Amino acid sequence: MKINHLDAFSDNYIWTMESEGKIAIVDPGDAKPVHEYIKKTGYVLTDVLITHHHWDHTGGLEEVIAEYGCSAYGPSGGHIKGVTNPLQDNENFHILDYYEFRAFSAPGHTNDQLSYFCDMTEKPILFSGDTLFYAGCGRLFEGTPGDMLFSMDRYKELPPSTLVYCGHEYTESNLKFAMAVEPHNQDILQSMKQVQEARSINKPSLPSKIDTEFKINPF
């Protein structure tokens, strides 16, 4: 599986998973970059993963479903239009006709937030939506600090080598906060240098890794 990103809005990422001419995407807040990428590559869109209900993660979902007739996995409850396969906490499902993912509840940013984990790739991967960021965590729109702590504890249980793909490019601002909290943390300083180099050539700072988050994330 190959993972790429599509830019959306000012700082959103729509993640793509590509294998043998097929593609799955995560959080299509805007349908336009999805259409353009599929037209360019000729891939067949088979699956969509939705992490939570916010418009910048779901805004293009109905248009994408109507255009490609693909499956859409997301939080249960019927509140996200376009989700064809609602998921419960710790429910497994398959995408791209092969890869098994586990959806698990990760509340805090929203109450319905799901994260998606797969260990069938070269390194384990996690799509964390807006709960876990590189060097940070999501703003509490609906959940409580206790909810966020619950979610952080769940992430701690994942393999340290897990690659973390979150929903936004917030890394530099997160690292600035982390530096203020731990000004002598050399791992934070090194991460900032690497991130600034990547952003200077318009490359994503992501993915992060779970073991990196243990070293630099103040949350």
List PLM regions with ranges.
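Active-site metal-binding loops of divalent metal-dependent hydrolases
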Residues: P28-D30, H53, G77-G78, H109-T110, ...
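Active-site HxH/HxHxD metal-binding segment of metal-dependent hydrolases
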Residues: I23, D30-S105, P124, Q194
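Core dinuclear metal-dependent hydrolase active-site scaffold
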Residues: W15-E18, N92-T121, I125, E157
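Divalent metal-coordination and catalytic microenvironments
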Residues: M17, D27, H52, V64, ...
